[in-house]
């Protein structure tokens, strides 16, 4: 498997994203071939969709002000967080643990990093549909059948640093199910599933960086995935709360687990 960093110009609201990517590939002499996987940050997709919010135009509610005071957030950011998140569980200073589109993420995916001063970026409106449309547009403009993976940075419990998380996939199966297979010693596997899209997201995320690298896209060649014509969002990659080892342990109404102070009982 080979990964190529795709540096682009600064993407602005309303830019034609596919044209920006194809222009960058051509400039860097990176050939686009069938069964390549184009990995895009959620932010570059959100920019093209105009998913930027000017904080000075947000009016915080009393609930948002309370949340902001508790976790040292801007009240305007807290208001957006309450609007964007499906669930709010708790948090630490500057970060609130939320459920957004079936993904556990900080601050409902809202980010001021690499956004214009005074603005924040939201997640794409519909990442699954965006991945599908980008894939179709690339095929129309180049004749190449590629897959598209939209990612963001995420966190793993009790681990330092960010990892890549898949928000949507078009063109390959995001999860490989090992249940029913046998291991080296002939023992049957009962719960193992391989997070293919998340693993590719982490590989791409490592090359993209988190600061001023200007690498919002990665082209992956020879990836060991099961290509298809499907499009997949969080629903196809989400683990039900009652089957999730973390959530079923820490949320009391998700099973016979004990309540943990600071986390309120909740499920989607």
Predicted regions, residues:
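N-terminal and secondary-structure boundary signal
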Residues: 1-268
